[in-house]
Swiss-Prot record:
UreD, UreF and UreG form a complex that acts as a GTP-hydrolysis-dependent molecular chaperone, activating the urease apoprotein by helping to assemble the nickel containing metallocenter of UreC. The UreE protein probably delivers the nickel. Coiled coil: none annotated. This is Urease accessory protein UreF. The gene is ureF. Belongs to the UreF family. Its main location: cytoplasm. It is found in: Cytoplasm. Keywords: Chaperone, Cytoplasm, Nickel insertion. It comes from Staphylococcus aureus (strain bovine RF122 / ET3-1).
């Protein structure tokens, strides 16, 4: 039997879903222009690093903490994590890009579902108390749909792997079949990343590799680009 609850959340993982992920490489384009990433093998190495760093210590850990806050109706905790997600994202393009994607996801989620938490989150943005982050909104949507946090994180990590791989297919470039092989190859690493997220302490939040952040910052000065970040 198909689990429609999970399918409703998985809809937001579609690389064609209009979240704006299509326009962001989150530093990948800088690595490509420097010829550090030039084929499927070098891209996989970068993607694993992105999973193990930014998506573990930032997005993934934030999702775990937000889910606990939702379970305890702790609005101040949610706002605190929203603020941390914004201020610890030092590269301007990725910081602004995450805010834009978060805004799109919140608006789309409100069009599709009547989630009190997402409606509250949107109101906090209008009151200038929140920035809106895609990882936080995705967690709120999964919580509203009754999906467990482990699955929510798995789906979010998969969405990032899928969208970044599609962007790599365009930018390196790679073939579509090569792209699908990469996604298949990364699935076990998604599970490993989620397990690592559940071993972290709250004090570990934001421990992103400086090399990744520096390349995200350097993207502001690339001569030719196809991505916003």
């Amino acid at each position: 039997m198909i689990d429609h609850t999970h399918l409703r959340l998985f809809q937001f993982c579609d690389s064609q879903f209009p979240t704006g992920a299509f326009s962001h490489s989150f530093g990948l384009e800088t690595y490509i222009q420097r010829n550090i990433i030039h084929d499927d093998h070098t891209f996989i190495a970068w993607l694993k690093m992105f999973l193990q760093e930014q998506l573990t210590y930032s997005d993934g850990l934030a999702m775990r903490l937000v889910y606990d806050a939702l379970e305890n109706d702790d609005t101040q905790k949610v706002l605190h994590i929203d603020k941390l997600m914004f201020v610890q994202n030092l590269p301007k393009e990725t910081r602004v890009g995450a805010k834009q994607m978060g805004t799109r996801i919140v608006k789309l989620a409100l069009e599709l579902y009547n989630s009190p938490w997402i409606a509250w989150y949107h109101q906090q943005m209008q009151d200038k108390k929140a920035k809106l982050n895609p990882a936080i909104c995705f967690t709120m949507l999964g919580h509203y749909l009754g999906v467990d946090i482990e699955t929510i994180i798995d789906y979010y990590l998969y969405q990032n792997v899928s969208s970044l791989t599609q962007n790599a297919v365009r930018a390196i470039p790679l073939g579509q079949t090569a792209g699908q092989k990469i996604v298949t190859h990364m699935i076990p690493y998604i599970e490993e990343t989620r397990k690592q997220i559940f071993e972290l302490k709250e004090a570990d939040f934001g421990m992103t590799a400086p090399g990744l952040e520096l390349n995200q910052m350097a993207h502001e000065n690339v001569n030719v680009r196809i991505f916003i970040s």
